[in-house]
């Protein structure tokens, strides 16, 4: 199985070199095409493109201006698994993982990215911000879906072909998973959702669902889960699988308050 996550906007402030083994992103050449486009953008254009405050636009302008096109490992880059710091990654809590769990995740966990397309946990990346839903004109079209869809779908097919149980577990957001061309994907997709139940009313609450997605990814990696039935046994933080509102392609977990 291959489990997919979204990236995070919040990033680790890199202060030290990551000393253990890392990898280069599989689609780095394509990513650098986008970096070159972003290097030509002004602070104002970046603010408009991503609907950012002046302060955030200036930060990301500097990031792109300083982006090392050679991806030198020593030059302010860091493994994706540890660089991303948002709600999903709080649930994932990768700093608590053992080396062998990270090694397992390298071939069983993927992160979709607006800039890099697809990332493995130990892929060394530079700080950036570029959401998948952004309308960035590029050689392939008017947005990043046009740029990445075929490429990302192909790489997912290649990775899934090497899995003992080739199923794509979708823990990514709708914005990011839209990049996957489901018609061209050769393998089954199972999407996992998390709901809160209060007074018999079901709600998906963004921040809680994100954290739960991270916890589920952690559960799958640390226990080397390789079947749908094992996924259904997940019960962290009070979430329980609900058969009544689930289907073969959609596993739904509920936490009762």
Curated annotation (Swiss-Prot):
InterPro entries: YaaA. Signal peptide: none annotated. GO terms for biological process: response to hydroperoxide. It comes from the Bacteria. GO terms for cellular component: cytosol. Belongs to the UPF0246 family. This is UPF0246 protein LPC_0782. It comes from Legionella pneumophila (strain Corby).
């Amino acid at each position: 199985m291959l489990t997919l996550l979204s990236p995070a906007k919040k990033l680790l402030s890199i202060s030290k070199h990551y000393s253990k083994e890392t990898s280069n992103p599989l689609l780095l050449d394509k990513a650098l095409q986008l970096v070159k486009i972003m290097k030509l953008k002004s602070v104002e254009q970046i603010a408009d493109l991503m609907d950012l405050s002046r302060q955030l636009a200036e930060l990301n302008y500097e990031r792109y201006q300083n982006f090392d096109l050679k991806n030198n490992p020593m030059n302010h880059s860091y493994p994706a698994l540890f660089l991303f710091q948002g709600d999903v990654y709080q649930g994932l809590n990768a700093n608590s993982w053992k080396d062998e769990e990270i090694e397992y995740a390298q071939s069983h966990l993927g992160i979709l990215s607006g800039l890099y397309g697809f990332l493995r946990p130990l892929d060394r990346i530079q700080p950036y911000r570029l959401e998948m839903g952004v309308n960035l004109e590029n050689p392939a079209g008017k947005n990043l879906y046009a740029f990445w869809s075929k490429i990302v779908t192909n790489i997912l097919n290649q990775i899934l072909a090497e899995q003992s149980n080739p199923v794509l577990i979708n823990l990514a957001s709708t914005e990011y998973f839209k990049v996957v061309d489901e018609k061209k994907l050769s393998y089954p997709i199972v999407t996992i959702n998390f709901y809160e139940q209060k007074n018999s009313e079901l709600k998906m609450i963004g921040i809680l669902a994100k954290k739960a997605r991270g916890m589920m990814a952690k559960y799958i990696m640390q226990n080397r889960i390789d079947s749908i039935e094992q996924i259904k046994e997940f019960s962290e933080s009070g979430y329980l699988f609900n058969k009544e509102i689930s289907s073969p392609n959609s596993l739904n977990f509920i936490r009762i308050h």
